[in-house]
């Protein structure tokens, strides 16, 4: 899919986003990827030959939303754990100095054939937002304590706890 005519115009951050998006699309069961996997996917895609050294730095720092900007302010990736990344989604936490920063490549900046990744990304984010409601750990606790109160009314419990207080 590589388009060498546009390789010099392609921003490193956009190349990193493309690599991460392709990994997510190829392996939808994976929640995140090792830094090395994203770098290797960018290399394999061959959007810029040879692979620019900046790709690694963007995956580690410049494009990672929840890390302090240094100097890149992009919000294209999200650090899920040490050495692990996934694409950033609206609603993810991010460093305050990255407010308003770029999340996806501009459609016109993508090499021919990669524009489909933008619509795929929107669908991926929508599906993840729906799943987040079902998987929220706090919401999962709803009703978990009802057995504790099954044989005693809450008011009676509080009254019993306060017996002997002065």
Predicted features along the sequence, with ranges:
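Generic secretory/membrane-interface signal
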Residues: 1, 37, 73, 147-149
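Phospho-regulated, low-complexity intrinsically disordered regions of nuclear gene-regulatory
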Residues: 2-26, 49-140, 158-160
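DNA-recognition alpha helix
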Residues: 19-23, 34-47
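Alpha-helix C-capping/helix-to-loop hinge sites
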Residues: 22-27, 45, 144-148
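Flexible coil/turn residues that form the inter-helical turn or adjacent wing/linker of helix-turn-helix
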Residues: 31
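Short linear motifs in low-complexity, proline-biased tails and propeptides
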Residues: 148-159
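Short hydrophobic/aromatic patches at helix-to-coil boundaries
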Residues: 163-166
